[in-house]
Curated annotation (Swiss-Prot):
FAD-dependent monooxygenase; part of the gene cluster that mediates the biosynthesis of aspernidine A, a prenylated isoindolinone. The starting point of the biosynthesis of aspernidin A is the production of orsellinaldehyde by the non-reducing polyketide synthase pkfA. Hydroxylation, methylation of one of the phenol groups, and prenylation, presumably catalyzed by the prenyltransferase pkfE, would be needed to yield aspernidine D. Subsequently, the cytochrome P450 monooxygenase pkfB is responsible for hydroxylation of aspernidine D to yield aspernidine E. The active site is at R264, Y297. Its cofactor is FAD. The keyword Flavoprotein applies. One of its GO terms (molecular function) is monooxygenase activity. This is FAD-dependent monooxygenase pkfD. It comes from the Eukaryota. Residues 25-39 have a biased composition (Basic and acidic residues). Disulfide bonds: none annotated. SUPFAM superfamilies: FAD/NAD(P)-binding domain. Pfam families: FAD_binding_3 (PF01494). The lineage of its organism: Eukaryota, Fungi, Dikarya, Ascomycota, Pezizomycotina. The keyword Flavoprotein applies. It comes from Emericella nidulans (strain FGSC A4 / ATCC 38163 / CBS 112.46 / NRRL 194 / M139).
Length: 504
């Protein structure tokens, strides 16, 4: 029998504010622990410099309007300009995919410089295939800092019931073939691939005008504007792009609280080994029980381990604009006070005043489409489908988004190159974004739903599985295999074909 307990790692939107400096990187790269609660960053590739217009004119600047009839045949031979809102991991990976294909892109990041957390996360072999499709440089960046699980199995343990000491389920680690690393290390590695000038920092999106002229006018908090042909919102779980696209009152404009919180830390490996024992401490293990569960695993080739405690916290979250708060370690210890001694020892390793993250997602109110009515604005990653971390696939879904977006935009622009008019350019962008949304909606939204279910199963909250090990295994196995066995290349090819069909 196999286990499917993979390595739930928090999404970008749920990361902490612990950061590591990237002192050897160019200019603005550094850390700012006050700015990265819901947005992570990383960026670099070497083929194009952005020419996107970014002016410091005020919001009353006159943009001469052109009648629809005069636009129909108007020549538009200039390079297409794509804006990505959000310089997180998915925003940067998407940018690298466009740069790799020679597409003009500028990333607008709200933070004043690159920052990232010191937490760990992992990518399956399917996610790595998607990275390779985006750009070989993305995969190279990961492999520079990541390492596979050294233990031959990923194992599930009952962390609560006395006497239940053996792993109840396990699977060969080669099945998902996770490669784990520190988020900060991956950012640093990606940063080595981004051309200078691609990312504009300190750009907080206030609004955009998606007008009939075929351009999108972005307005930023600092009073500057930028006019582009298309926008990709990769601005995280609290996406401003999504809110503008849907409207403030739309049910899907904001994410919802899942009544689960997480305590996470990167710990000395020797401490984890002392708590769990030599075998478990050096491997990828999950311990589940009532209203909580833990995940622990070594990080890459470092003497460190990633540890997360998830627990139920029912009711509402007081401030949905702030997804983390500092608490006392005792609040985490209370969640496992009746658990086995080794799990209590593991949780005791948390710092005295750890951060507690409220886990939000978009499961209750999914967006109706990933593309705006005009077809020139779309959303990706957490902005489109913010997930809980229980399927360990939230970041992977964003990478798949990037693979599809890079492919369909490249396809559409090749089709458009034979007729460079404003209308044809608009049609090309719309075809690309609609193909992306149509291909990605079902899979990514299913992951959001399934991840929520896996969390309930792990915390013995699911009515159908309760504490029955076999039922828990079957419920989770089904959902994990749909992630692991997915054909990313076939999906990308379907998206390419759909884009051509929509453009023709």
């Amino acid at each position: 029998m196999g286990s499917l307990w993979s390595s739930p790692s928090l999404l970008p939107s749920q990361q902490d504010n612990e950061t590591e400096p990237f002192s050897h990187l160019p200019k603005e790269i550094g850390t700012d622990p006050t700015l990265r609660e819901d947005s992570n960053v990383s960026n670099r590739n070497s083929e194009a410099a952005s020419t996107s217009t970014d002016s410091s004119t005020n919001t009353n600047e006159n943009h001469a309007s052109t009648s629809q009839s005069s636009l129909e045949g108007a020549p538009d031979s200039g390079p297409i300009k794509i804006a990505i809102i959000g310089g997180g991991i998915i925003g940067i990976i998407t940018a690298l995919g466009l740069i790799h294909r020679g597409i003009n892109v500028t990333v607008y990041e709200r933070a004043p410089k690159y920052t990232e957390t010191s937490a760990g996360f992992s990518f399956s072999k399917g996610a790595r295939k998607a990275m390779e499709i985006v750009s070989p440089r993305v995969l190279e960046a990961l492999l520079r800092v990541a390492a596979p699980n050294k233990h031959p199995f990923i194992r599930y343990f009952d962390g609560f019931t006395p006497g239940a000491d053996e792993a109840q389920w396990q699977i060969p680690a080669e099945r998902p073939d996770y490669y784990g690393c520190l988020r900060a290390a991956f950012l640093e590695s990606l940063g080595q691939e981004v051309p200078e000038g691609i990312v504009k920092f300190g750009k907080v999106l206030e609004s955009y005008e998606d007008n009939e002229e075929g351009k999108v006018l972005l307005r930023f908090r600092d009073g500057s504007t930028a006019e582009v042909d298309a926008v990709i919102g990769c601005d995280g779980i609290k996406s401003r792009t999504r809110r503008i696209m849907l409207g403030d009152t739309h049910p899907a404009a904001a994410p919802g609280y899942t009544e689960i919180v997480a305590y996470r830390a990167v710990l000395p490996l020797e401490g984890v080994v002392a708590a769990l024992g030599e075998d478990r401490g050096h491997s990828h293990c999950l311990a589940v029980g009532p209203d909580a569960y833990t995940v622990s695993y070594p990080i890459a080739n470092k003497p460190l381990a990633n540890m997360i405690l998830f627990r139920k916290q029912r009711g509402s979250w007081a401030n949905s604009d702030k997804l983390l708060e500092t608490c006392h370690r005792s609040t985490a210890q209370d969640a496992v006070k009746d658990w086995k001694p080794e799990i209590q020892r593991l949780v005791d390793l948390l710092p005295e005043n750890p951060n507690k993250w409220a886990i939000f997602d978009t499961s209750d109110n999914p967006v109706p489409s990933y593309v705006s009515a005009s077809g020139r604005v779309c959303i990706a990653g957490d902005a489109a489908h913010a997930s809980t971390p229980f399927l360990a696939s939230g970041a992977a879904m964003g990478v798949e988004d990037a693979a599809v977006l890079a492919t369909v935009l490249n396809t559409a622009l090749k089709e458009q190159s034979y007729n460079k008019t404003t209308v044809v350019k608009r049609k090309a962008i719309t075809a690309a974004f609609q193909a992306y949304s149509g291909i990605r909606m079902q899979r990514s939204q299913r992951v959001v739903k399934d991840s929520r279910t896996v969390g309930e199963v792990c915390m013995w909250q699911d009515a159908e599985t309760a504490r029955d090990p076999e039922k828990c295994f079957q419920a989770i196995w089904q959902r994990y295999t749909q992630i692991w066995e997915f054909d990313v290349e076939e999906m990308v090819e379907r998206a390419r074909s759909e884009c051509v069909r929509l453009f023709s």
